Amino acid sequence: MSSYLKDIQIVCQHDLPWDKLSGCKILVVGATGLIGSCLVDILMFNPRRDYDVYAAGRNQERALKRFAAYAEDASFHFLKCDVTEPLQGDIQFDYIIDAASNASPNFFANHPVEVMKANINGITHLMDYGLKHGMKRFLFVSTGEVYGEWTDEVKDEKSYGFINVLNPRSCYPSSKRAAETLAMCYAAEYGVDVVIGRPCHTYGPFFTESDNRAYAQFIRNAVAGEDIVLKSTGLQYRSWCYVVDCASALLHILLKGEAGQAYNVADSTSNVTIKALAEIIAEIGGVQVTSKEPTAEERRGFSTIQRAVFDTTKLESLGWQIIPGTMRDKLEHSILSLR
């Protein structure tokens, strides 16, 4: 069994009120993405599972390959779904998790309109469907980028910084901010029970082929035995989180979070620069870190935020904690799972 699956099993033993899911139908949208697929894995590996999991995504071929282990399981279902269009069907989902989003810099640079539509139209269509079909709770997977640029040493959930709304790169944080507000509007006007998770930069093994975020490129290089190419100074200082810890946090928010609240998701033991991240991955992979000037297109997708360190006191009050191991351990688990 891979280290990743062992990590999944640890989360399944966490003290969560799994009984809330008993007999329920759970929809995970964006199920083939890094975070969405990990949520599906935890829900399916849970030994106390007595619910149905619906994994929704645009690419059926990718989904069937990613979730091949569950193909014969009667409680697993794939649902072909593009969140930019209204959700079809008449299934009554008790819990909807919206983890659908284009979060790669190449999308920010080349398809900012589509990024905004997926975030804003996506939550609209899912909320409308949930309202019509008696949904119990909606979990929106947002981003720590909603805080914009700030001067605080560590960021809690109470205040927000500057986002340049005239910069197309702001398509991602601006649309996530708008989607959060829209979620609160559904709560106020229609009584929807909604909770929000704001993940920091998240890493793990099963990212998509099109993901060109720094961590994904670094891990690809290490797996292939190629030197890691750093295309910036690498001095941006960030909170990071292993995807299994992130998915665990989101399940704590789903099952124990207070309605109408947002929670930062980060590992306080994993605050490092991008350069340091590259060096850790290079050491694991036995390769070197080199540097190269980014192209104009790559530069357009870069975040201008230099420091993004998150306070997770609020999340920890729900009883969440990371699984045992250092950041290096979890990066190694990610790399070994892909070899």
Locate the predicted segments by residue:
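Amphipathic terminal alpha-helices
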Residues: 1-20, 50-51, 325-339
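N-terminal Rossmann NAD(P)H-binding glycine-rich loop of SDR-like oxidoreductase domains
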Residues: 26-45
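Conserved glycine-rich Rossmann-like NAD(P)H-binding loop of the short-chain dehydrogenase/reductase
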Residues: 48-63
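NAD(P)H-binding glycine-rich loop region in Rossmannoid oxidoreductase-like domains
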Residues: 80-118
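Conserved Rossmann-fold NAD(P)-dependent oxidoreductase catalytic core, especially the SDR/UDP-sugar
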Residues: 124-169
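NAD(P)-dependent short-chain dehydrogenase/reductase
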Residues: 150-159, 181-238, 243-254, 279-284
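Active-site helix of classical SDR
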Residues: 171, 175-178
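C-terminal substrate-binding subdomain of Rossmann-fold SDR/epimerase-dehydratase oxidoreductases
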Residues: 224-339
